[in-house]
Regions:
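Alpha4 helix (beta4-alpha4-beta5 surface) of REC/receiver domains from two-component response regulators
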Residues: 62, 83-105, 118
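Short amphipathic alpha-helix used as the core "switch/output" element in two-component signaling
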Residues: 39, 61-74, 93
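Charged docking surfaces used in two-component/phosphorelay signaling
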Residues: 15-23
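A Lys-centered signature of the CheY-like receiver
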Residues: 109
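Helix N-cap/capping motif at the beta->alpha junctions
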Residues: 30-39, 60
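Receiver (REC) domain active-site loop signature in two-component systems and cognate sites
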Residues: 55
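Active-site beta3 strand of CheY-like receiver
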Residues: 44-50
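Active-site residues of response regulator receiver
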Residues: 52, 80
């Protein structure tokens, strides 16, 4: 059963993701912010992390950078409702920034449950392939 860490300050988002993933045979740990996510990461081996970009206190970008530094082999999915730069706007492309900081994939809120599951399965498959390649090299 894959272990997923969900880090988001919105309890409704966390609950929806948790319920959906548990119904699909994932073990889910929810953290309500970056600090709580780091504490969870220290005590548990996760197969994947899902992290919101915009959170109070420890910002999502800071969380993504630190999570990636501490656990570089764990796939990290960044999510945000304020994610894409509009061609007519000078706003930054936050999801691209998350990828540059170490996120494996990005999801723009709102996303469908199927989109979430697809991204998770792709990340887990890629991580398993990398692990298998490393083991075969030894």
């Amino acid at each position: 059963m894959p272990r997923v860490l969900v880090v988001d300050d919105d309890p409704m988002v966390c609950m929806a993701i948790e319920i959906y993933l548990e119904r699909h045979s994932f073990h889910v740990t929810v953290a309500d912010g970056g600090e709580a996510g780091l504490r969870a990461l220290e005590g548990t081996a996760f197969d994947l992390m899902i992290v919101d970009i915009f959170m109070p206190h420890m910002r999502g970008f800071e969380s993504i950078r630190i999570f990636h530094e501490r656990a570089p082999t764990i796939p990290l999915v960044a999510m945000s409702g304020y994610a894409f730069a509009n061609l007519d706007s000078p706003a930054p492309d936050f999801l691209r920034m998350a990828l540059e900081l170490g996120a494996t994939r990005c999801l723009r809120k709102p996303f469908t449950p199927l989109a979430l599951l697809t991204v998770i399965n792709e990340c887990l498959t890629e991580a398993q392939s990398r692990f298998t390649s490393v083991v075969q090299l030894r």
